[in-house]
Amino acid sequence: MAGLLVSKRLAACVQLVSKLESHYRWKGKKEISREILLIIKTRSSLYKKVEAAILKNHSYEVPEIICLPISKGSKTYLNWLAKETAF
């Protein structure tokens, strides 16, 4: 997933945080799963395309896809992010 998003220029960077254990309810049952958290660095204007790519390629019926706004960031980093996600 990470490689796909970066190669399609939908993300400038994707960090994988592994060895997570998620506890949740699914279809009336308590579940525990090992998961990998992806932190996807992209522009908000690409959200719908990123979401579509994740939904198409993810094994979960309802994967967690949330968007957190960047309230502040270094100008050089944000410029790099914009450049790497430009078409």
Provide a role label for each language-model segment.
Residues M1-F87:
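Positively charged, small/polar-rich N-terminal and surface patches that mediate targeting and assembly
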